[in-house]
Amino acid sequence: MRFELMYDSFFKIIQGIPLTLEVVLLSTIFGLFLAVGVALMRVSNNKIFSNFAYYFIYTIRGTPLLLQLFFIYYGLAQFTFIRESFLWFFLEDPLFCGILTLTLSTAAYSAEIIRGGMQSVAPGYIEAGSSMGMSKMLRLRKIILPITIRQALPAYGNELILMVKATSLISIVTLMEITGIARTIISKTYAPVEIFIVAGSIYLLINFIITRFIKYAEYRLNHGSIQ
């Protein structure tokens, strides 16, 4: 085990942390907004909305994330009308394609988490809101979503961890995040074991921080709720 190489490589690999966190943050924010919309469509009585959400979730969850990334970054470029449209300004950028892929992925998984949280809301709470004269939108904002967040947070925390690990795939499209830098170092040093141990340790540290944050958020939500 070449510890000096591991030490030197650590300071190079951590330079990929900002890009990794940028991708995770943007994908999570956009994905969460999209997930709420998809979840609302999924529980809607409108068959068109419900079916669209169902097939969106089924397609994203049923196909490999790497395949989705290849389709968006390489596949869409094969269509002339896309290359000649304003979309090409965005789709030729590997960072945009990586964020878009992860956004769609986390939206599909998070939508099911949110849907489960919505369906766990006891009918009595909704009936109480109706009896107080709350509109449907007000009940959603004041009753359904707060309870949904509390119920869905543990599972959503796991989704965040999966998102961090999934960012390693975007190195395939030449982005120099943690794994991308690690692969570059390996190509020069031919020491995959040492370098991947360092990269894996960095991922572990990031996910440890996320786990502790989620645990704290769970405590605050449960501590402030009426038991």
Question: Each PLM stretch: what is its role?
Answer:
Residues 1-227:
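Transmembrane alpha-helices and adjacent helix-loop boundaries
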